[in-house]
């Protein structure tokens, strides 16, 4: 506890200076930085650095969730105390994700299958590197899936879908929009969040998206 309390919390300006100094907008440099951790930052600081280094945020419509929002959201998820095995889906995992808190939430369930999806290959690879610095419970099996969730074909249903799906509209990509509408009830929208909610509702009884 003392070690955590003594950790310096970096401001956004300080993090941006680190991003510029190490040229972390380049995903290759960011991966090396996370792996080597030359400044010996704690895991939360590494997550923050990774988020602010993500130059693809606008391209993939990905926006990351504040820690306090994630904490409050996970605390209200069903406990599944009567279950020995559950399946969880995170359909747009990004970099700052729910995984560490899900580890704590479901540490007493014997078997947890956790499928994490992201359309951005670099975000998935960076997420993996960050998780390597986190103690993953033995009861968790994590499957990383580099796919577009909206057209991805699931093999089974889930007990829980949780995450922070992308916001924004599909513009100037008619073929992509047509493929989303083809598998959706709402044919009038081009909003990604709407498509995500509709598909998530087909996959699980419990849905928690923000």
Model-based region annotation:
Residues 1-110, 115-134:
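Class I S-adenosyl-L-methionine
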Residues 86, 159, 205:
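Conserved acidic residues
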Residues 97, 121, 186-210:
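Conserved Class I SAM-dependent methyltransferase catalytic core
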Residues 122, 152, 168-170:
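Active-site loop signature of alpha/beta-hydrolase-fold enzymes
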Residues 149-156:
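Short conserved loop adjoining the S-adenosyl-L-methionine
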Residues 158-164:
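Short SAM/SAH-binding signature in class I
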Residues 167-189:
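Mobile active-site "lid"/loop adjacent to the S-adenosyl-L-methionine
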């Amino acid at each position: 506890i003392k070690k955590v309390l003594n950790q310096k919390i970096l401001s956004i300006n300080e993090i941006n200076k680190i991003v510029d100094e190490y040229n972390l907008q380049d995903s290759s440099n960011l991966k090396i930085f996370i792996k080597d951790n030359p400044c010996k930052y704690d895991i939360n600081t590494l997550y923050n650095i990774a988020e602010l280094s993500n130059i693809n945020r606008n391209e993939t419509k990905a926006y990351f969730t504040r820690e306090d929002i994630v904490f409050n959201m996970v605390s209200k998820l069903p406990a599944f105390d009567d279950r020995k095995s559950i399946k969880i889906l995170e359909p747009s995992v990004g970099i700052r994700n729910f995984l560490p808190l899900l580890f704590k939430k479901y540490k007493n369930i014997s078997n947890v299958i956790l499928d994490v999806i992201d359309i951005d290959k670099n975000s998935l690879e960076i997420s993996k590197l960050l998780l390597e610095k986190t103690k993953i419970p033995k009861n968790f099996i994590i499957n990383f899936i580099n796919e577009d969730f909206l057209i991805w074909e699931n093999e089974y249903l889930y007990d829980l879908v949780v995450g922070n799906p992308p916001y924004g509209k599909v513009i100037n990509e008619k073929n992509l929009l047509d493929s989303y509408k083809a598998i959706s009830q709402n044919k009038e929208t081009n909003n990604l969040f709407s498509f995500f909610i509709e598909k998530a509702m087909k996959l699980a009884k419990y849905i928690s998206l923000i």
